[in-house]
């Protein structure tokens, strides 16, 4: 059997780390078993689906390195859905309903008040043809529900959670075709999964109830049921993650936070598994590590600091030739290999390099302790002449110690503040050659 997985986002908002994790896991599973990965755009919601969100989904997935063997939009397949609709009507699994949302809400409240679960009463099944004609004449619009077999337990062996059971009598018949004739996601998805021979459906555990219903839809359409797996959800410290809450979207991580794509991939592929979350440099490494059985059933708490730490590890170990084109893209085409090697250990994101470029070549230095003025003047006098190298620092420091008897923080901190304006950063021995002898001397003497 060929493994075929899919990712089916709705173009109603931007991708966030929760749904990207689903995409990544499905992609990794397909790659692990030499299968195919399909991108399906669930755009049947005509009011909320936007072209710009569709384009953003494509862009974000490509940025992460997730590619697909084929792609399609559900909005191009209405003829297929219409044929399935007629089949299900003729087989008695779709039936007409005429209740308004207000009527359904009254029924729901009545059931809850009586201590019953809000399960649709199936009153519409009792309507005669004449009654349906009368309702239509009175302006009531038809919608369709899928008839759940309530005498049959729904059971599947989940790839992540193990055996899951649903009592069919506790499942309400879902509306699958709206009053405007639009078929909703739940049934469209099953029709597509059948035609595209999806072998494994892996998605968030918030879809478990949908899965129970869709199992009966597969059976009603005479199709085999794919392997099913449900990932635990990702939550933030403050609660739910969604496309409508800021701070979790891929464009925020990429454009505002400055995160590398592999930092996102590492965190989402390895969090909530028995594997350590480490900084792998390629998706190929993650494919090798990938094991669906390693995924935990517990909720994952997303921590942005953990993502930034992974990002730092990646940058620290990134070679200059690999990053050079990216430096040009962010407006720093003149960064040399020496500069990159000097500052990369102090970068949490690539954009941080702009701070050190500013410090070395476009300084605005205002931090200085007045009592250190004479010390800095002496340090300037002791600075080696000629071009500074990595070795210049050690010679310079030894001469300063001999002349002032200063050591440790009392020696290094005034120099760091005078030369960089901040109390932390790359080793000064590597910054000196970058700043240059004349500029180092000028910075030391500017306080005289």
Curated annotation (Swiss-Prot):
Catalyzed chemical reaction(s): tRNA(Glu) + L-glutamate + ATP = L-glutamyl-tRNA(Glu) + AMP + diphosphate
Location(s), subcellular: Cytoplasm
GO MF annotation: an example: ATP binding
EC number(s) per entry: 6.1.1.17
GO cellular component: cytoplasm
Main localization (coarse): cytoplasm
Domain of life assignment: Bacteria
Tagged with keyword DNA-binding: no
UniProt motif 'KMSKS' region: location: 240-244
Amino acids binding ATP: 243
Primary role: Catalyzes the attachment of glutamate to tRNA(Glu) in a two-step reaction: glutamate is first activated by ATP to form Glu-AMP and then transferred to the acceptor end of tRNA(Glu).
Name the record gives this protein: Glutamate--tRNA ligase 1
Biological source species: Orientia tsutsugamushi (strain Ikeda)
